[in-house]
Amino acid sequence: MAVIDKGFGAYDVRGIYPDEVNEELAYRVGRSFPTLFGAKKVAVGHDIRLSGPAIRDALTKGLTEAGCDVVDIGQCGTEMIYFATAHLGLGGGIMITASHNPKQYNGMKFVRAEARPISSDTGLKDIAAMVVGETYPAPAAVPGKIEKADVLDAYVKHILTYVDVSRLKPYKIVVNTGNGAAGPIINAMEKFLPFELVKVYNEPDGNFPNGVPNPILQENREATAKVVRETGADFGVAWDGDFDRCFLFDEKGDFIEGYYMVGFLSEAFLKKNKGASIIYDPRLIWNTIEIAEQLGGKPVMCKSGHAFIKDKMREVNAIYGGEMSAHHYFRDFSYCDSGQIPWLLVAELMSASGGKTLSELMKARMDRFPTSGEVNSTVSDAKAVMDRIEAKYGPSGKVTKVDGLSVEFDKWRFNLRMSNTEPVIRLNVETRQDKALLKEKTDELLAEIRA
């Protein structure tokens, strides 16, 4: 079985099974991980992908041969590995998942002690080198032990601490787990909540009979939106396969962009934690900054990407961090991202709103700071395009380069970023209460980018 480093990315390992991610790769990762991170005991779990158990067995074999004990938490979501690693005081955690990729993929995400992220510049490249070169030490004299652990009840109990359950209204909520790993979690939480949950594709199934669980894709949204409209639900939630991201739909079935969720969740935390810091990414910013400042919070900008966000949150002791890509991070969840905490906070904010619908709560913000949404353009020379745009717009605006190129004017601003993996430039534009200006500037920039 060939072992190549093609699947090693900036934040995880991900590739087609068995060509790029396979049992031999997993075994070698297991042999390497304890040496590189000093881990004596590691949590291991897998999502619903069909190759998950085989990769888990090979990974576990490698870990135990390296003398490392394994806590096998079984089928789970990525955040449950974060939780188990921190909650049980382990030396690391490995989640077998390819998140929202098609079913032929699998992969691994890694954390060290305290559920701190491992990315390319904090150890992932070292894993790749040791795996491909087979430079890990000889097997330990005493192999590690394997124990099975069920962390579901402790995890659910922790998740529910983020809201006052007694104050939640009995909403009807559509929950679409996309045949991913979130189904059993929803079932376990249901008995503690006053909601009527309308379940869609709730059975975990690695064949993905209803499509890839990736609600960011336009074609996957209608399944949730349709049921919201048909059942008269108060709102809808959809998750990706390993449920580290959740996506919200209002009572009309309209998709709520992740940007506005960052502001909404900032509000949830700052109402309870006066003066706290919150983290936001540079793509779209004005709504989040205004909400934070109005509530006496400290908004702090950070480059997008989970390793950057988590490090910045620790640095400034931020209570919450959000990215418009629907990743939401929580200080009391070991600074990790969760796809289960956000929808509960939305229900809590709605419950305290005096009967307002989700669309009513969101509309004011969306009208105040309308956005283009992220628009992708394929270009032959991304760097040249970035330089050209900066030369044209930079001199008359305020330029920042925390993440890509941001240029700000009185009434509008934009952010332009290059993709790390493809010849694509991503554009986000926002204005102050001016949809006509938004269209004008978005069209103008796209013409310039694609010229």
Predicted features, each with a name:
Residues 1-61, 65-67, 145-171:
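An N-terminal, well-structured beta->alpha segment
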Residues 41-47, 71, 172-174, 276-282, ...:
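Short glycine-rich phosphate-binding loop at a beta-alpha junction
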Residues 106-231:
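Gly/Ser/Thr-enriched, mixed-charge loops and adjacent short helices
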Residues 124-157, 161, 251-324, 328-330:
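Proline/glycine-rich low-complexity loops and linkers
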Residues 273-451:
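Phosphate-binding and adjacent anionic-ligand microenvironments
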